[in-house]
Amino acid sequence: MKCKLLCKLKGLFGIYTPGCEYWVDLKDIDIPIDFLRHHPRQEKMEQKWAYYRQTGEFESPILLNRNFELVDGYTSYIIAKTENLHKLPVYFVD
């Protein structure tokens, strides 16, 4: 509980601790060109969609670097964008 509160407070000041979950605006996430050039396989997307429909959660976490560039979780990003979600749970990595 103490860690979650500390992470939220740091997030208010733009300080993001790796390993803590934060909610960010979809529009603030930058997608590197490599992700845009290579679309996920259809089977992979179908699996990710099935999981999302069953649980309401992403199967893969969305990982960002400190510049808000996507590091991993592109399939979850695609689902969020398709569903017109505005805020997403993300984790920051070094």
Model-predicted regions and their roles:
Residues 1-94:
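Short, charged/polar connector segments at secondary-structure boundaries
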